[in-house]
Amino acid sequence: MLNMSKMFVGLFTVILCLAGTLSVYTQEPTVSTPMTLAPVPLETVSESDQYSQLSMEMAQLRSLIEKKADKPGASKGWSAPKIGGRFFMDYVNHMDQDWDGLPLGSNVTSQNWCGFREARIAVTGTGYDFLDYKLELGFEKNASSCPSYKDIFLGIQHVPILEYVRVGNQYVEDGGSEICNGTTNYTFMELPASLGQQFMSRRLGVTSRHLLADDRVRIFLGAYNATNISDSHYVKDDNQGIVLNTRTTIAPVFCQDGRRLLLVGAYYNFTDSTGSRPLAFNRPGGWDVYNPTGLGNFYSDRYQKAGFEAVMQAGRFCVQTDMFLQNYADVNDGAGSGIGNQTNYGGFIMAKLFLTRNDYRKYNLKNGNWDSVDVSRPFKLADVQGVNWPSGCGAWELAGMYGVYDSFVFSTSVPAAADAKMMNQQVGAALNWYWNPNVKWAVNYFHDMTKARYDGDYYDPRGDYLGMSCRVSF
């Protein structure tokens, strides 16, 4: 009984404790009277020393910007001129020639040479946010003692409808991307033979360029004087002729300055009163060497050229092609003796591969041509503990090319009624080493194959050429 009473006492104690706890949690909270705090004065931002110092620095910076904008060379005037150019040293060796059987031909071994090839110096600049200019002079191996005019033009932006207009001596875009490069960015030392034989180079004229679809569509129009103005002694005559030229390119794929590129284009050239023109050259591109099958000059009342171009570049690898047709109306010797209308065709295909990773050639959509090589690891000398060691390997490029050009042959030394044709085929290989975007070492090898027919006789001359070059641009 005693144990039972103790158990009841303990149970009663637990119940009392639980009841007390529940009463605490169920009790209504006590509401306290809020305290009123006295206002504390705070320093405003405009009165702080830090803000005053920042305002003074901003005012000084604004004053410097305004003073710089007022100086010549800002958007209110002309920029400071920039000087650029290039310098080429070439070596050319003619190996295994077989030209002796050709009319007016001869062995060309004596034309091997090594030395200065070409130099250019140019001044460029901009002004008033809508003008640009370029003045360029050329010094070349076979030119006269006087420098020749190259690019000399004034460009005007934001022209209604035409968008961008150039006036002056400039390239006639009667070819694809390779033609419009200028010699600085050629893959080979010269143009493929099919292009280097018949194109207009520079002429005095007016051109316009219109860009659409984020610059992926480019439309080019030009009107020029048909006569080449090459030196300061040129005197205009009364029969200058006119050149009308257009070129359109479309790049549905373009990223990273052309690292991924798919481009197609077409061009057309019409020339009235062509004047005296050299015949097709059987030589590697435009090298300044003897021409074994260039049989004089001819005249033509009208000249037309139409072509197609395409480029596909995927990183280090690129394939490029250009094909064209030419038509000469009333080919003659300038004295009435001629062979009527003549049509030529030609083209080339080129494959290029950079052997070094992450290197590729950039493409300029606005200008419609190739730009400099993007060299990820430039070759240079680095100071390591007082000793200069090579650093970086530069960019190495391997290229192959096949070109063909089928043309008529005309010369005052061959009867006008003669059935004369010539087909020139050329295969080439190139190994290029770019120390950086401005320095290039090149080795080129060409094999030239020509099938010629003069007055019923057939000729099959061939030749091999080795070329090396050091090219520096700045």
Predicted regions mapped to residue ranges:
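Short, P/G- and charge-enriched loop/turn segments at secondary-structure junctions
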Residues: 70-73, 193-195, 294-297
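Outer-membrane beta-barrel pore domains
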Residues: 31, 45, 95, 107-108, ...
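Extended alpha-helical regions
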Residues: 61-62, 132-134, 196-197, 212, ...
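Long amphipathic alpha-helical scaffold segments
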Residues: 57-79
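Outer membrane beta-barrel
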Residues: 74-96, 100-103, 108-231, 235-274, ...
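Domain-scale selection of a single, long terminal region
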Residues: 2-12, 241-247, 256-274, 297-333, ...
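Cleavable N-terminal export/targeting peptides
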Residues: 1-61
